[in-house]
Amino acid sequence: MAMTLSLAACGQKEAPAASSTPAASSSAATSTPVEPVEDDVWSSTDENGNLKLTERDDIGENGMVTTANVYATMAGLEVLEQGGNAVDAAIAISYALGVCEPNASGLGGGGFMNIHMADGREVVIDYREVAPMAQDAYTWLDESGEVKDNGNANHIGGLAVGVPGTVAGLEYALENYASGKLTRQQIMQPAIDMANEGYKAGGTLVGAINDYYDYMVTDYTTLGGYYLNADSMPYEIGDVITNPDLANTLQKIAEGGKDAFYTGEIAQAIVDEVASYGGVLSMEDLASYEPAIREPVKGTYRGYQIVSCPPASSGGTHIVEILNVLENYDIGAMGVNTAETLHVWSEAMKACFADRSAYMADTAFAEVPLTGLTSKDYAKTIYEKITDESQSWNAGEPGAYEGNSTTAYSVADAEGNIVSVTQTIECFWGCKIAIPEYGFIMNDQLHDFDTNPESVNCLEGGKKPLSSMSPTIVLDAEGNAFMSVGSPGGLRIWPTVAQVISNVIDHGMRMQDAIDCARIYERGNADGICWETGGEHEITEDVIAALEAQGHAVTQKGSWDLFFGGCQGILFTDDGIQGGADPRRDGKAIGF
């Protein structure tokens, strides 16, 4: 199962200088480094504090777990070893990631779970956040039509918070797709134990604390109380972080299920704290939340079946759309990260992003031409417009092809069940509001709405903002599980997932090599092609020069840059189940 977190969608702040302002600590939180509980736990960083570029993958015979953090991977593995299935493990991983990767996802967020059961059942559980009923398209705008609070009102503070869906989505999965062999308590116990006993801070988490330190010592000191040390300074790699408040909250959910979170004391604490930062989330908003149960978006690519996430995520739609375009080329013969290949990828990405802006939204509020956008005939029209020169793209006309009729982890078990999940609190540390005495962070998911009141993706009460989350499962021609893949990364999510799929199918790469491979991103703005240095099959200066000669603008990113996501994937082969994890973040795959 592949769980992907939408991170890094927002800009990052400068690293902290020493502050004289102490961070307020929750009465129940323990923020003092202690001796490591387990010294032999694999670390994502080397002795110099740099992310390891190797040791991320593994081979399994009876199952595979790959997540954005080794502690979450171990939580999923523990549940599988106790006899749980891939869905049980996915639930355990989700709660565990909220403990050890709190900057990226957790109880205050939402996501999508893509499930393929060995008996043929398929479903996408959409537990995306929704806008509070009291908000509308003008919520954030001042009299001149600009976003309030210096442009921050839609992603920092109370007006950025959507109704969280994680607990409701996981409860639906537990009730309908879990093995039935394990109780909720057993599935959640690894996360509860981790919050109580502690986990070692990895490089990505430490970087996120440093990047947002200023928030933690000024307006959002409850957040700082949980994620700064006793001296109100950022943790260092290898320090052990505990969160007893979060452990207590998880225990309440383990005992009381969905109602324990959406009604009663936890819900009231959410409403009160969000209101203290100007929000309008209500008890009624929380009590009425239900996940949406959807059919996946489907397509094919060179004989493989693509099964991905439907709206309100745009991701699955555009993965199918761009692969349909690429199918018109012999990508394998064109080579890995050659100028010819990257030019085609760039033009196809621009076309898909133009369609995204024009058509994609919550289908409960807008007509989305889904059949047209995923049609091979429509993709052929895009292919026919691609020339040897870079060009600007406007939205196409997919309606003409309509018939009658949008952190990452993956888990697979011995029975052939496979799950791919993407979940998030949106930007790193969400809206920056932590719930005191309960230990979790609220999302800033409303940031994904367009601030233009005329947009198809404008803010409306009860509406889900457009997402790029793309937990994807690939099946072979006979319908057997072949691959599971997902990634965080905001708008880079679906381009990343599509590139990894192509690396496996077109270039015959192993799962880890497909993830390690250098990536690009192009959405048609002034940055042009964003490209990273480093990585496997490194993009060379000669290739960049050739792209510039074709009229492409280019923007160089860093080496192994987390801008391009943190992909986790599983590949089924005759030699075993391959698990791959992204060295751009703290991910680790473990098989059994």
Annotated model-derived regions:
Residues 11-13:
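Bacterial signal peptide processing site
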Residues 6-9:
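C-terminal motif of bacterial Sec signal peptides marking the signal peptidase cleavage site
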Residues 34-74, 86-87, 91-256, 261-263, ...:
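Noncatalytic scaffold domains of N-terminal-nucleophile
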Residues 79-80, 168-176, 256-263, 268, ...:
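Alpha-helical support elements that line or immediately flank enzyme active sites
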Residues 99-124, 280-282, 417-483, 507, ...:
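Active-site rim segments in enzyme catalytic domains, especially the processed small/beta chain
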Residues 292-293, 403-406, 467-469:
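Short, small/polar residue-rich loop motifs at catalytic or cofactor-binding pockets
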Residues 415, 463-465, 497, 506-561:
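Extended C-terminal subregions enriched in glycine
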Residues 42, 328-425, 437-438, 445, ...:
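Internal maturation/activation junctions in enzymes
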